[in-house]
Amino acid sequence: MTKQTKLITLIGICLCFCMAQFAFAQSDELYTRDSTYTFSETSGNVSLLRLKKGYLLGDGITFISGKGNFNLSPSLQTLYLVNSTNKNLSSPSSTFVINRARLNVFSNLFDNKVSLSARLNFAANYASATTGNRSFNTVLQEANIEYRPNRTHVFNFGLRADYIDGRETRIEGESIGFIDRSLLSDAFDAIFDFGIRYKGNYRLGGKHLLKPYLSFTTGDGRSALQKNYGGFKYGVRLDYLPFDKFSRGGEFYMDDLYREEKPKLVVGVVYSYNDGATSAKGTNGGRWLYGDANQNILLPSYSKFGADYLFKYNGWYSMGGFVLTKAKVPSNIAGEFRLDGSFSAYTASQTAQQIKDRVLSRLNLGKGFNVQAGYLFPVDWAVGARYSTLNENNVTASFSDYDKSYTFVTTKYLSGHALKIQFELGYSQLKEALKTSTQNGNYYSQLQFTIQL
């Protein structure tokens, strides 16, 4: 092991063992915190707020009026990575980056019936799965309005992380139990999209809960803020909770911070259909546009099926998911549009099968599986392990150099997800076709600090 690798490994282990402890977790469910606010009257009108009593990291700064509130919450994640692609760990490389630098804006109005949410990421490091880009917004991640007529029904309008990706994407980047999302999520989850959504919360009797989610979006991701190039994406998710809801939003973060006294489980299935896919997985909309002989736009359809679960009990948690994607190509595609908008017709020598394979090769097609588990010790120190595998369709171009990934993480929670240190060791295995006598994968260690104000 090299000096660089030894150093970052030693730093990570020391920090995780030596820090003191303190707790708050994120949730996409709206709830009222039981803290007290201090007001100052102004002309008999509105009250202004300062930091509330009992303030915890992650609460943000909130301004209160008689009809609602307005919250600002910045967050920062710094990442230090050392990795090597050689079997003997020689010639390592190091990367120090700002992983996330976000500003969250949230407002509640009219007794929590209406909420507004926006999020900016000033450290966006998005890289398209395929080269080229027509339009892409790297800073604005969320901007939406939510209407809650009652506790059962919620309607959402705008840009946000979608309900119809894997369960990992329901968890904020600051609240996942690992430093990075899994190989499965990277391959198949578009995450952000612009559209109209519905979510429900139905009690079936006793402790049984059913949560349906419906989604109607552009299918172009954040590119849709400039133009919707393709058709639309339709999706549905159905979650079942047999043992009632999780404590304090525990459905929307990984480690069992509040040590569930009784077993909690959510099992879900999800399906989405994009009737006009223009990018590899719905992230970089408008990347690939095809047309018929008259230059009318023709696009492939892209469908995705998934199943997942999350279980928690007494400090333990386990989460897993499976994804399968397929596509269908129109038979009369005659060419494609270049990034400058001009049309490039395919040659007469290209067969229908070759054209079909060309279109399919630009989509993330295949299947994958991810499973992970972890335990939180009473001293707010957690350990976890994860295994992910991908099986690409034979026709699709390689959207990942790796087909298996093994990850081990330890996390020291100083104030819940609002202040924590994570250290991770991992190995991603190269696909057989890419292995050499000296390289069979990527070995890495990384250290990340997270703070949310």
Question: Which residues does each PLM region occupy?
Answer:
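N-terminal periplasmic/intermembrane-space "pro-region" immediately following the signal or transit peptide
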Residues: A23-Q77, L209, Y240, D244, ...
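Bacterial Sec-dependent N-terminal signal peptides
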Residues: M1-E29
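Outer membrane beta-barrel
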Residues: D59-S84, S90-R222, Q226-D244, N364, ...
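Outer-membrane beta-barrel "beta-signal"
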Residues: G235-K245, K412, L419, N440-L453
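Detector for outer-membrane/organellar transmembrane beta-barrel domains
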Residues: Y229, D239-F243, S247-N393
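Conserved C-terminal beta-signal and adjacent last beta-strands/turns
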Residues: K367-V383, K404-L414, L419-F423
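Gram-negative outer-membrane beta-barrel domains
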Residues: F110-K113, F232, N314-G321, T407, ...
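Outer-membrane beta-barrel translocator domains and adjoining extracellular loop/strand segments
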Residues: S84-S91, A127-V139, T169-E174, A224-Y229, ...
